[in-house]
């Protein structure tokens, strides 16, 4: 069964791409009676506030017609930023040797919160070095993953 995020991603991918952007990912967070839909867009040239505003109008129009969310919600459109969230295998693969922070659904090595270096990805399995130990983590066990920005 498709999750709400999967259905929303399928619904919003084409309108976002029609504006010349990539749908980096999305998060649907339920908070009581009110929810938040965060849509992350990216582009090789970078994302500017005008891009977010234009995408927000387009996405809002699609959501108004399709009406996939039955509760009240707030739509937020932004770039992934420097501490970008990672959603897909190819995104993790693009950041091999980079440091990430991940939250897991089920603990691995006794923890649900890990910080480590991406050392590889094979299929839907992520290799992560944490404190010198190599861990293999199923992508579907990752609740949230973010790059840790280098300054």
Curated annotation (Swiss-Prot):
The keyword DNA repair does not apply. The keyword Zinc-finger does not apply. GO terms for biological process: ribosomal small subunit assembly; translation. Pfam families: DUF150_C, RimP_N. Keywords: Cytoplasm, Ribosome biogenesis. Transmembrane segments: none annotated. Its main location: cytoplasm. One of its GO terms (cellular component) is cytosol. It is found in: Cytoplasm. CDD domains: YlxS_C (cd01734). Disulfide bonds: none annotated. NCBIfam families: PRK00092.1-1. Required for maturation of 30S ribosomal subunits. Belongs to the RimP family. This is Ribosome maturation factor RimP. It comes from Shewanella sediminis (strain HAW-EB3).
């Amino acid at each position: 069964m498709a999750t709400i995020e999967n259905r929303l991603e399928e619904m919003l991918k084409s309108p976002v791409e029609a504006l010349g952007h990539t749908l980096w990912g999305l998060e649907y967070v339920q908070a009581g009676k009110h929810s938040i839909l965060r849509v992350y867009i990216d582009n090789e040239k970078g994302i500017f506030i005008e891009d977010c505003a234009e995408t927000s109008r387009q996405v809002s129009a699609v959501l108004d017609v399709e009406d996939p969310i039955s509760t009240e919600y707030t739509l937020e459109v932004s770039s992934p930023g420097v501490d970008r969230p990672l959603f897909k295998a190819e995104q993790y693969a693009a950041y091999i040797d980079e440091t990430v922070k991940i939250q897991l659904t089920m603990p691995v090595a006794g923890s649900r919160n890990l910080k480590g270096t991406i050392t590889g990805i094979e299929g839907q399995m992520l290799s992560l070095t944490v404190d010198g130990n190599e861990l293999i983590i199923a992508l579907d066990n990752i609740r949230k993953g973010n790059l840790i920005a280098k300054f």
